[in-house]
């Protein structure tokens, strides 16, 4: 008789650290899961492990929609290499879609908003047409598939509700195009986007880009050409290589 404990090894192996051949990856991520999604748009983010990566850009297993997550999984769950620099170009202010009013069933004080990519800012939750206040009447948690739990709080206005309604907006990765990956420099503000952000890696992180990638997007000829051009004379000093996708569709060799 008694209580016995055992320690199980984590499923994530400790990554091998090496700054030679530093990966700099441009793509999309579920930044709606962050406290400040806008802060993770078109900036170089250095990550050393899986936890840091998830905290930096969020995570979702839908690799077709969220290309940076595919690299996070490959680097930290499969191969075990670190660090790498992530540049997310999915902008919640631009790449988004409306969520029409949805009715949710409440079970044991929890309702699930069955939409992926929900933006918490601007989300309206109602119980019997009465708007609920986040933090006072309910809290939210993310599910592994990217959907959102609405957890009703005791003493809140919706405590006894059996159904809730939700309206708002969500990020839409399908609206990110090749031009967003290639990026540019805004003439009036000087703000760099897309591959132009590669220039910021050395002055901000004191690390030199070694391998440039834009997974899935680099199957596009324009993105591929931009990647190759960007490998030359980074910060007027450094050189790099790039890895591009090959279009495997029937018209890929045309």
Where are these regions (language model features)?
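Surface-exposed assembly/interface segments
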Residues: 1-254
């Amino acid at each position: 008789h008694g209580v016995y404990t055992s320690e199980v090894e984590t499923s994530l192996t400790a990554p091998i650290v090496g700054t030679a051949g530093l990966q700099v990856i441009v793509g999309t991520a579920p930044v709606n899961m962050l406290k400040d999604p806008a802060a993770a748009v078109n900036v170089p983010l250095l990550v050393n492990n899986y936890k840091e990566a998830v905290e930096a850009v969020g995570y979702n297993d839908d690799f077709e929609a969220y290309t940076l997550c595919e690299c996070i999984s490959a680097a930290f769950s499969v191969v075990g290499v670190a660090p790498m620099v992530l540049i997310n170009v999915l902008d919640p202010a631009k790449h988004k879609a409306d969520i029409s009013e949805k009715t949710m069933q409440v079970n044991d004080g929890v309702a699930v908003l069955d939409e992926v990519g929900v933006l918490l800012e601007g989300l309206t939750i109602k119980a019997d047409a009465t708007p609920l206040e986040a933090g006072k009447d309910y809290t939210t948690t993310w599910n592994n598939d990217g959907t959102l739990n609405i957890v009703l709080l005791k003493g809140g206005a919706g405590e006894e509700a059996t159904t809730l309604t939700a309206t708002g907006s969500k990020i839409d990765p399908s609206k990110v195009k090749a031009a967003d990956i290639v990026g540019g420099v805004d003439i009036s503000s000087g703000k760099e986007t897309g591959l132009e952000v590669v220039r910021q890696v050395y002055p901000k992180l004191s690390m030199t880009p070694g391998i440039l990638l834009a997974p899935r997007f680099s199957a596009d000829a324009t993105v591929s050409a931009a990647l190759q051009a960007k490998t030359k004379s980074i910060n007027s000093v450094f050189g790099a290589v790039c890895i591009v996708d090959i279009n495997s569709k029937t018209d890929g060799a045309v």
